[in-house]
């Protein structure tokens, strides 16, 4: 009996690893991209995810789809590091998007790496004084120490940035999230599906950027107006179709303009 138990224990890591389903790219491109999605979201939105994959490959990205019933951030990080190493020579991993309910790393002991967030970690609850950060995923050189799993939100895990870890941010790839806000109500899977359909539709349009809105918030380098002296030059160089002579084409907002600037920002998003 003990031999059987020992065999099961030894095989357990391989069994868990085998659960992750990896859909390989349909085309070979210079760089690679990964869609990381939870199994429930994939089951409800598979056609939209595949259509999204196809437009990414049309843009020149060999796109992988990684899906599983993700339980911890460690599982996701392990798979991304493995994929990054696998693709390093022939098609380096360029970026990742997390779709649906992907575990979130709540990072502590790292406020020297944040731009504006500063809070006493000793006197405030962990949920408030920790930083939800995907640098846990896209900075594989950083070292973390697990503190605890959240008891009310299964997606949250708390980590300390280790003292012997590199103390800088140097992402190996870019990352983003597609997640439906619970505050909106309704079916989150339908919401994600609609969003992906919209993304695919927009990718099929020939529509060059000719309207731009910028916003400089409080508690960042926007406090120093000198830092923004050359912003107009940078905008002209990067967005040549934005006619800076027309007020409606380029709007630059600053937190000093109003006591409650978020409503003006919301208006711009609606516009």
What does each model-identified segment do?
Residues 1-21:
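Bacterial Sec-dependent N-terminal signal peptides
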Residues 19-271:
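Cysteine-dependent hydrolase recognition
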């Amino acid at each position: 009996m003990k031999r059987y138990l020992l065999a099961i224990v030894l095989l357990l890591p391989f069994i868990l690893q085998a659960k992750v389903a990896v859909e390989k790219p349909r085309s070979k491109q210079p760089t690679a991209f990964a869609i990381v999605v939870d199994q429930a979201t994939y089951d409800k939105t598979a056609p939209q995810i595949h259509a999204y994959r196809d437009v990414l490959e049309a843009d020149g990205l060999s796109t992988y789809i990684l899906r599983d019933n993700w339980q911890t951030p460690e599982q996701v990080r392990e798979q991304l590091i493995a994929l990054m190493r696998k693709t390093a020579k022939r098609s380096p991993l360029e970026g990742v998007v997390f779709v649906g309910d992907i575990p979130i790393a709540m990072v502590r002991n790292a406020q020297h790496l944040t731009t504006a967030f500063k809070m006493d970690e000793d006197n405030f609850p962990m949920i408030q004084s920790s930083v939800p950060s995907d640098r846990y995923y896209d900075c594989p050189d950083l070292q973390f120490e697990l503190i605890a799993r959240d008891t009310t939100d299964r997606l949250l895990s708390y980590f300390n940035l280790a003292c012997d870890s590199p103390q800088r941010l140097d992402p190996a790839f870019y990352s983003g999230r597609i997640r439906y806000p619970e505050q909106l109500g309704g079916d989150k899977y339908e919401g994600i599906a609609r969003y992906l359909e919209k993304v695919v539709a927009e990718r099929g349009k020939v529509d060059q950027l000719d309207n731009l809105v910028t916003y400089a918030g409080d508690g960042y380098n926007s406090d120093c107006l000198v830092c923004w002296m050359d912003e107009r030059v940078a905008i002209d160089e990067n967005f040549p179709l934005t006619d800076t002579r027309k007020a409606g084409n380029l709007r630059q907002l600053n937190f000093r303009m109003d006591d409650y600037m978020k409503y003006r920002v919301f208006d711009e998003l609606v516009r």
